[in-house]
A protein has these predicted regions:
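Short basic/hydrophobic patches in alpha-helices and adjacent helix-turn junctions
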Residues: 68, 223-224
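Soluble catalytic domains of membrane acyltransferases
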Residues: 92, 96-223
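Membrane-anchoring hydrophobic helices of lipid-metabolizing enzymes
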Residues: 2-125, 130, 159-162, 167-169
Length: 224
């Protein structure tokens, strides 16, 4: 069945109007943060996120999820945790332009690198703390790893992200069939692969997560 006209119009609007405009707003901000000291960039983004995010509908979702995880905490405690969450997320965004600098300054602490010095290995990460560091773990161990990534919804920003990943000394595979082939090839060659285990899924196996059946990726378990 052909896509309806409204869908095609939205795709054209996003590609030629929405995405370029959003990128034009995001790129100067990224460059501005990059010229700031990393600690100031981190703090400013933390404050900005803490100021704006609680006013959005996402804040209700965050608090709803926290009540599932911490059912015994009071509403006041949940509010405090939500504010801390938004501040930390803002800090993470503020640190993204400074990934290389933070690594060179020794601000990234890694444990267990000796376990992946040789032979095949599977790295499993999550969107906790500064998740972009996962893409550098293989390089820190002296290995050229392969990582699965989910493209940014904005095609302009996605191209910029791919360019940024060139600093990681790694191979990146877009989520899908080709990623599975690339990762399998890496492991068969005795190399390192990595993926995040908490990406939005509509497939996978259903696993109870805090009492709620949740679609869960099984790629790492299958490959191992």
């Amino acid at each position: 069945m052909a896509n309806p006209l409204s869908y095609r119009l939205k795709k054209c609007f996003d590609r030629y109007i929405h995405d370029p405009i959003a990128a034009l707003l995001a790129i100067p901000l990224f460059l501005f943060l990059k010229i700031l000291p990393y600690n100031l960039s981190s703090y400013l983004c933390g404050i900005l996120m803490l100021t704006i995010a609680p006013l959005t509908s996402y804040n209700k979702r965050v608090k709803r999820h926290m009540k599932i995880v911490f059912p015994k905490k009071s509403s006041m405690e949940i509010d405090k945790l939500a504010r801390e969450h938004w501040f930390m997320l803002g800090q993470t965004i503020g640190e993204m332009p400074h990934i290389n600098k933070l690594i060179n300054l020794g601000r990234l602490k890694t444990e267990g690198l000796e376990k992946i010095n040789k032979g095949p290995a599977i790295l499993v990460g999550a969107h906790m703390g500064n998740w972009e560091f996962l893409g550098r773990v293989g390089d820190l161990a002296g290995r050229r790893a392969g990582y699965v990534f989910r493209p940014v919804n904005n095609w302009v920003l996605n191209k910029i992200q791919i360019h940024r990943n060139k600093d990681a000394n790694a191979d990146f595979y877009r989520k899908g069939r080709l990623a599975a082939i690339g990762m399998a090839g890496k492991l068969k060659a005795g190399e390192v692969v990595g993926l995040t285990g908490d990406q939005l899924l509509r497939e996978g196996i259903m696993v109870p997560f805090f009492g709620i059946d949740t679609p869960t990726p099984q790629a790492a378990a299958i490959m191992s």
